[in-house]
Amino acid sequence: MKNVLSIAGSDCSAGAGIQADLKTFVANGVYGMTVITSLTAQNPQKVKMVEDVSIEMLRNQLEAILDVIEVSAIKIGMINSKENAELIYDSLLKYKVKNIVLDPIMISTSGKSLIKDETKDFLVNKLFKLVDIITPNLDETTEIVKMILNNENIENIDSVEKMQSYGKIIADFTKKWVLIKGGHLSNNAVDILLNSDETYILEGEKIPNNKTHGTGCSLSSAIASNLAKEYSMLDSVKKAKNFVLCSIKNSIDFGEIGGTVNQMGEIYKNIDIEKLY
């Protein structure tokens, strides 16, 4: 079994963050481990508080795993502190881990900023160029392009063509794969996977509900799982999209505040848990 590491924030409601990552790893047949960058007090409706772990704690977590355990892929999620981002960057260089997926979490599903401005600059200009694939949503894509072009007047994305254009700007700047997540754009779940030379428009079924907390985290973790299992980048993304679709179809309903995706839902359909133990 391959080992996959999530470097991300903790979500106490377990819909997103490292909790979503661990459930995704289990559902995709890899062994999941975590390095926590921040503690968040949040639910599908709002983020109440974000508190970064100390640089000492982050360093010791990274060393505890990477010094002694072979890691086949890494998923990176929320990094709020620039100091922590710098340490993660240095650690990736030191340990030379392959198959790094970066979900540049800047804005929560509920619309709250999750990252400091100084950290955004470091991510875009340094960390982006060290990973294998970046998976921004539409708002994050626009924000990243504004930073790359140093132009605050960039229009928001309102078409697949603009998704592709902005994605190409990021891909050319980073020389890496980019997956633009366009789930909020149209009636279809249209994502665009591209690098400097290749472009793939990936369409899928869209489930219209408000129980989608954790979709981005689950997608990036599933991509990392598939890369660890030696699938190509295109196949890793396609399989991850199908996994997230199943997780949405089996989502957990919390009532008025919406709900969260259920990464284990499809597995539970095919296994009688009560007969296992």
Descriptions of predicted regions:
Residues 8-13, 200-214:
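Short pre-catalytic strand/loop immediately N-terminal to key active-site residues, enriched for Gly-Thr
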Residues 49-52, 234-277:
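Charged C-terminal helix
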Residues 29-33, 199, 226-240:
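Phosphate-handling active-site elements
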Residues 117-199:
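Conserved phosphate/ATP/ADP-binding segment of small-molecule kinases
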Residues 2-6, 26-109, 267-269:
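Conserved N-terminal subdomain of the carbohydrate kinase-like
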Residues 86-94, 176, 190, 198, ...:
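Nucleotide and nucleotide-moiety/phosphate-recognizing core
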Residues 19, 142-143, 209-233:
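Short, small-residue alpha-helix embedded
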